[in-house]
Curated annotation (Swiss-Prot):
Gene name for this UniProt entry: menC
Pathway: Quinol/quinone metabolism; 1,4-dihydroxy-2-naphthoate biosynthesis; 1,4-dihydroxy-2-naphthoate from chorismate: step 4/7; Quinol/quinone metabolism; menaquinone biosynthesis
Family membership noted in the UniProt record: Belongs to the mandelate racemase/muconate lactonizing enzyme family. MenC type 1 subfamily.
Top-level taxonomy: Bacteria, Pseudomonadati, Pseudomonadota, Gammaproteobacteria, Vibrionales
Protein name (record): o-succinylbenzoate synthase
GO molecular function term, any single one: magnesium ion binding
SUPFAM superfamilies on file: Enolase C-terminal domain-like, Enolase N-terminal domain-like
Cofactor annotation: a divalent metal cation
InterPro entries (UniProt xref): Enolase-like_C_sf, Enolase-like_N, Enolase_C-like, Mandelate_racemase_C, OSB_synthase_MenC1, OSBS_N
Leading EC class: lyase
Reaction(s) catalysed by this chain's protein: (1R,6R)-6-hydroxy-2-succinyl-cyclohexa-2,4-diene-1-carboxylate = 2-succinylbenzoate + H2O
NCBIfam families found in the cross-reference section: menC_gam_Gplu, PRK05105.1
Superkingdom assignment: Bacteria
C-alpha cells in the first residue's frame, strides 16, 4: 500500500550567506517521503529565495496535490508542477524505484571566498584536478579581474569557473577582461552569464576568447541546447530547472554537442546535496559538479555529506505537515 508524508525543515545558515543582497539566515524546505509498502524514499523541495519562481507556500500546495495524484495512481506530469517540486518528487521516485546509483561524486569545485592568501595555500594543497569557483560581479570589475589573474598566476595548474550572475554591463565585462592576462584566459574553464543579456555575453566571449556558460539562460522560456561560439557549458541547478528527467535530457543534449554539463547546487540541505552528487557521478562522470555549499549551513539533514562534521538533524524531529 502506498503512503506519503511531507516534513518541513528549518536549518540555520552561516551568517555570511547573501543572496542578491538578501541575507539568508535559515534555509526552509520540505521533504517528501514516499513508500510503496516495501521501500521508502525521500526527496527535497526547497525553493531558493530570490532565485526560484515559486515561494515555499506555493511549492507546498503543489507538492500536496502531486502527492495525492501519486497516491491515487494517476498519470503524473512532473514538469507541469513548479521546478522545486518536480525535482524533489522525481528524485524520491527515482530512489523508490532504485534507479539512482549509490556512488556519488563528492569532489566539489571549492567556492573561493575569504582571504585570498589563505585560499592560495588551500588551493595549492588540493589533490587531483584543480578547479575552483569564484563569484564575480559583486565588487568592481577591475578588482575581480586582478583577483582572478592573481590566482591563475600563482597556481599554474589551476582552472577557474567564474559566475557573474548577469551582473555586468558590456563595459564592465570588458574592464574585467582587460585585467586577465591573455595567456591565462584559456584556464578560465568558463564564466557563467557575464552580461545582462545572452547576446552581450556571446559578444564578450568572441571579443576576449574567454569561454562562457549558460546558467540563468537554461531556465529561460524556449531555451534549447545548441552549439554557439564561445559557449563551453551549461550549468544545471535541478531545484530551479525541474524534474531529474528534464535535467538528464539537458545533460544528454549538451554532451551530444561536445559541451560540458555541470550539476550545481541551489543551497539544498545535505539530503538533496548527496543525491545531486550521486546524479553527477551517474550522468556527468567526467565533470566536477558545483556542490561546494554544505559549509554554508550550521546543520545537516537526514543524510550526512562525506567528511562533514556538522550535526545532523533527523527527520523524526521535524514537523510533519501532511500525511495520508
Amino acid at each position: 500500500m502506498k503512503t506519503a508524508k511531507i516534513y518541513q525543515y528549518q536549518l540555520p545558515m552561516d551568517s555570511g550567506v547573501i543572496l542578491r543582497e538578501q541575507r539568508l539566515q535559515q534555509r526552509d524546505g520540505l521533504v517528501i517521503e514516499l513508500s510503496d509498502g516495501i521501500h521508502t524514499a525521500r526527496g527535497e523541495v526547497a525553493p531558493l529565495p530570490e532565485f526560484s519562481q515559486e515561494t515555499l507556500e506555493q511549492a507546498r500546495e503543489d507538492l500536496i496535490s502531486l502527492t495525492q495524484s501519486w497516491l491515487n495512481n494517476e498519470e503524473l506530469d512532473l514538469d507541469s508542477n513548479c521546478p522545486s517540486v518536480a525535482f524533489g518528487f522525481s528524485m524520491a521516485l527515482l530512489e523508490l524505484e532504485k534507479q539512482l546509483p549509490q556512488e556519488g561524486n563528492y569532489q566539489a569545485a571549492p567556492l573561493c571566498s575569504g582571504d585570498p592568501d589563505d585560499l592560495v595555500v588551500k588551493l595549492n594543497e588540493m589533490s587531483g584536478k584543480k578547479i575552483a569557483k569564484i563569484k564575480v560581479g559583486l565588487y568592481e570589475p577591475i578588482r575581480d579581474g586582478m583577483v582572478v589573474n592573481m590566482f591563475l598566476e600563482l597556481i599554474s595548474d589551476l582552472s577557474l569557473r567564474l559566475d557573474a550572475n548577469r551582473g555586468w554591463t558590456t563595459k564592465k565585462a570588458e574592464q574585467f577582461a582587460n585585467y586577465i592576462h591573455p595567456q591565462f584566459r584559456s584556464r578560465i574553464e568558463f564564466l557563467e552569464e557575464p552580461c545582462t543579456t545572452p547576446e552581450e555575453s556571446l559578444a564578450f566571449s568572441k571579443a576576449t576568447n574567454i569561454a562562457i556558460a549558460w546558467d540563468e539562460t537554461v531556465r529561460d522560456d524556449g531555451f534549447t541546447v545548441e552549439t554557439q561560439e564561445g559557449v563551453a557549458a551549461i550549468v544545471i541547478k535541478p531545484t530551479l530547472v525541474g524534474s531529474v528527467e528534464k535535467c538528464i535530457s539537458l545533460i544528454e543534449q549538451a554532451h551530444q554537442l561536445g559541451m560540458q554539463a555541470v550539476i550545481s547546487s541551489s543551497i539544498e540541505s545535505s539530503l538533496a546535496l548527496t543525491q545531486l552528487a550521486r546524479l553527477a557521478a551517474w550522468k556527468t562522470p567526467e565533470t566536477i559538479p558545483g556542490l561546494d555549499t554544505i559549509d554554508l549551513f550550521k546543520m545537516q539533514l537526514d543524510t550526512s555529506w562525506p567528511n562533514c562534521d556538522l550535526p545532523v538533524a533527523q527527520l523524526a524531529d521535524l514537523e510533519v505537515i501532511w500525511e495520508n
